[in-house]
Amino acid sequence: MFLQVEMYLSFKKKYSMKTNFNFNSVLQIWNDYKVLFVFSDDNRVSCRLSFYNDTPQDAIISDLYVHESIRKQGGATAILNWCFEYAKDRGCNSVSLRSDNDDWVREWYKRLDFKVISSQVWLTKNI
């Protein structure tokens, strides 16, 4: 069971040297965690920011998406910076995420001061 609380946070702030993005959010609250869906006005940049009750000092970013027509224009950096600020304002001292094993993506996250703390291997079995 969850209690949905809609909260639209909208503001313009220059997070990127190339462009301004206006972000909105919707917050959903369950018993043991909260999820903030963050998206640009035109829905071409979006992600989820989760907060779990058992690790309140850490926020988790997932499902980062930037439409191909605006990639490499600062949208991903802008929405991540929005998430960093939002999480910090709520008492978090770290933000975590999982990334594909792609050198370019991993290096991009490192430029944003993310540190690799583990690696995973996905296994499959035909049945």
What kind of region is each of these model predictions?
Residues 1-42:
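Short amphipathic alpha-helix that is part of the acyltransferase structural core
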Residues 11-14, 86, 108, 112:
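Alpha-helical interaction/dimerization surfaces of two-component signaling modules
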Residues 28-34, 41-42, 46-58, 64-65:
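A conserved beta-strand-loop-helix scaffold within acyl/acetyltransferase catalytic domains
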Residues 33-35, 117-122:
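Short hydrophobic/aromatic beta-strand or adjacent loop that forms the aromatic wall/cage
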Residues 66, 72-85, 111:
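Conserved acetyl-CoA-binding loop-helix of GNAT-fold acetyltransferases
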Residues 77, 101-119:
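Conserved active-site alpha-helix within GNAT-family acetyltransferase domains
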Residues 87-100:
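Conserved GNAT acetyl-CoA-binding A-motif
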Residues 123-127:
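Short beta-strand-to-coil "C-cap" segments at the C-terminal boundary of structured domains/repeats
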